[in-house]
């Protein structure tokens, strides 16, 4: 992938949401920041938390919006503009209801599937044509509201698996950066 890349982990700010399904993007961004070897700092022009460095040998801007999920675009858009990153060089890491828990899928473009964070980013960029690292959380049981489900903490059984899933999603992000979409999909989708 061309440089620089903007890699964005989606989530909601604050301790109330820190361990919820909707914050998997933030969790992966934290792992990637550790791999870069830097701490997040507030980017004054966008308000997002940002780390700059190299992942998979590529120059990246790693970001976590500090606004609520459904407003993510208002910080991602200014970051993309500030760093002159076109949409096809943006990778958004997020939770995905339509994928089984723990599965990871990569794609470029497509719909938002009811994900308001993706909708906000697409609106701010003026296109849906950006890369996604989709981390499955599965559908809620019974008739539970999906919006409430993603804002709940993981079950005890899920919690035991989350650290491994987050590391795998970070690995998938680095593979996408290093190899491009199709080769990375061939590897990640076989996991």
Curated annotation (Swiss-Prot):
Chief location of this protein within or outside the cell: cytoplasm
Active site, UniProt feature: 22
GO biological process, one term: rescue of stalled ribosome
GO cellular component annotations of the record: cytoplasm
EC numbers, comma separated: 3.1.1.29
Quaternary assembly: Monomer.
Catalytic EC class: hydrolase
Taxonomic superkingdom: Bacteria
Compartment annotation: Cytoplasm
Family membership: Belongs to the PTH family.
Catalytic activity as recorded in UniProt: an N-acyl-L-alpha-aminoacyl-tRNA + H2O = an N-acyl-L-amino acid + a tRNA + H(+)
Protein's recorded name: Peptidyl-tRNA hydrolase
Gene name of this polypeptide: pth
Site for Discriminates between blocked and unblocked aminoacyl-tRNA, residues: 12
Function: Hydrolyzes ribosome-free peptidyl-tRNAs (with 1 or more amino acids incorporated), which drop off the ribosome during protein synthesis, or as a result of ribosome stalling. Catalyzes the release of premature peptidyl moieties from peptidyl-tRNA molecules trapped in stalled 50S ribosomal subunits, and thus maintains levels of free tRNAs and 50S ribosomes.
InterPro entries found in the cross-reference section: Pept_tRNA_hydro, Pept_tRNA_hydro_CS, Pept_tRNA_hydro_sf
UniProt KW keywords: Cytoplasm, Hydrolase, RNA-binding, tRNA-binding
Taxonomic placement: Bacteria, Bacillati, Actinomycetota, Actinomycetes, Mycobacteriales
Binding site for tRNA: 17, 68, 70, 116
């Amino acid at each position: 992938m061309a440089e620089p890349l903007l890699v964005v982990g989606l989530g909601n700010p604050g301790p109330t949401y820190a361990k919820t399904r909707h914050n998997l993007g933030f969790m992966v961004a934290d792992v990637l920041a550790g791999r870069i070897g830097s701490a997040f700092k507030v980017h004054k022009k966008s308000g997002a938390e940002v780390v700059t460095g190299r992942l998979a040998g590529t120059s990246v801007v790693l970001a976590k919006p500090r606004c609520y999920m459904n407003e993510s675009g208002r910080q991602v858009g200014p970051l993309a503009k500030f760093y002159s990153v076109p949409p096809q060089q943006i990778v958004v890491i997020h939770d995905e209801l339509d994928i089984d828990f723990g599965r990871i899928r990569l794609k470029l473009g497509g719909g938002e599937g009811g994900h308001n964070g993706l909708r906000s980013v697409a609106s701010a960029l003026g296109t849906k044509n950006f890369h996604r690292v989709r981390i499955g959380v599965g559908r809620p049981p019974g008739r539970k509201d999906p919006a409430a489900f993603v804002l709940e903490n993981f079950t005890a059984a899920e919690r035991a698996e989350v650290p491994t899933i987050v590391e795998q999603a970070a690995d998938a992000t680095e593979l996408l950066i290093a190899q491009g979409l199709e080769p990375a999909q061939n590897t990640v989708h076989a996991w």
